């Protein structure tokens, strides 16, 4: 007689699309909300491949016996590295950044992802959206805002109806109790009391949520293709540990972003918005290569964790290049 609990078999077969592990579903996942993406770099010197540098560095460190052809190639790499002015390193590396078509808080607001009685959260949310988005909220109906966001006329689903009810209630205005005091607030009042004045939505790196049974690297490549319109075979994934960005968002939920590092194969590739790419057209407003300083300054000041990802990567690449350059010079003197 089989006395095994059937629920345990179900748990073993279940798959969490959040953390990518078996044994539970995403609603029961204890991990932060996970997105996976790629930070793609461009090195503004021809014939410098970061994966090759990392590989050769390990071989030199491990006293690998190089062939004559490999030594000739190493000498060519040294000649290229000798042209690099590390005092101008900030302009040597460029990073591929994307700008959201709509700010994250605006999307959450239109989707009704808030407690209408949570005044503190609503104040933060309205503060983090752009000036243009505030004007749209102030001057347009919910039907218009919904269609403008999603690019379709699907106004019959449950999320639309629930979000519409919340929006119209906020438009009309309502009283809530805060610290035992009845406070009146409305959309107009929230907009009037905003402090920040952002001109454009957030800039960041291509990333997104996992599909069912999708591995981390598969998710990262798919999201990269959808958001940049650059095929993943046009980049090389660098043999580096993925970087992580973990933070507590304004909705009090914990998020974790995992970024693989990649190098573009052809420096002449110009990123652009492709109107035939529906995923990109709906989600992405702009895309471009940026120097380290420009990228660091365009990321919103409160996105400290994202700035740290960029800074740590930038310093790490510099260390890899400098360390290889020094060890290569010492090695070639012995040949």
Where in this protein do the model-derived segments appear?
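Active-site micro-motifs of SAM-dependent methyltransferase domains
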Residues: 103-105, 226, 297
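Core residues of folded domains in eukaryotic genome-function proteins
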Residues: 12, 34, 94, 201, ...
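Voltage-sensor-like transmembrane helices and their cytoplasmic interface
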Residues: 17, 223-226, 288
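Nudix hydrolase/Nudix homology domain
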Residues: 2-15, 27, 123-129, 137, ...
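The catalytic Nudix box helix
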Residues: 199, 204-241
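Cys/His-rich microdomains that often coordinate metals
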Residues: 23-24
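N-terminal strand-loop-strand
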Residues: 32-206
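Cys/His-coordinated zinc-binding microdomains
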Residues: 20, 30
């Amino acid at each position: 007689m089989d006395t095994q609990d059937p629920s345990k078999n179900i748990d073993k077969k279940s798959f969490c699309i959040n953390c990518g592990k078996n044994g539970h579903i995403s609603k029961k996942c204890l991990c932060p909300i996970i997105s996976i993406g790629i930070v793609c770099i461009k090195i503004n010197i021809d014939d410098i491949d970061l994966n090759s540098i990392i590989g050769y560095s390990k071989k030199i460190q491990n006293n690998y016996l190089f062939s004559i052809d490999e030594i000739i190639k190493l000498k060519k790499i040294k000649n290229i590295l000798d042209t690099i002015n590390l005092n101008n390193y900030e302009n040597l590396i460029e990073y591929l950044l994307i700008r959201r078509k709509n700010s994250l808080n605006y999307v959450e607001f239109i989707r009704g992802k808030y407690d209408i009685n949570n005044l503190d959260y609503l104040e933060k949310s309205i503060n983090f959206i752009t000036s243009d988005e505030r004007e749209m909220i102030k001057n347009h109906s919910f039907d218009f805002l919904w269609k403008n966001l999603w690019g379709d006329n699907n106004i019959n689903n449950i999320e639309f109806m629930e979000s519409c009810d919340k929006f119209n209630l906020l438009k009309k205005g309502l009283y809530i109790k805060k610290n035992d005091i009845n406070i009146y607030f409305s959309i107009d009042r929230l907009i009037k009391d905003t402090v920040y004045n952002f001109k454009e939505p957030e800039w960041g790196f291509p990333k997104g949520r996992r599909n069912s049974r999708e591995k981390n690297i598969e998710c990262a490549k798919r999201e990269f293709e959808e958001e940049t319109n650059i095929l993943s075979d046009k980049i090389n994934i660098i043999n580096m540990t993925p970087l992580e960005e973990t933070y507590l968002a304004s909705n009090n939920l914990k998020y974790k972003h995992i970024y693989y590092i990649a190098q573009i194969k052809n420096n002449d590739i110009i990123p652009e918005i492709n109107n035939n790419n529906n995923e990109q057209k709906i989600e992405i407003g702009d895309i471009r290569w940026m120097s380290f300083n420009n990228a660091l300054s365009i990321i919103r000041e409160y996105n400290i964790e994202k700035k740290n990802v960029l800074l740590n990567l930038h310093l790490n690449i510099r260390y890899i290049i400098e360390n290889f350059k020094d060890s290569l010079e010492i090695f070639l003197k012995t040949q």
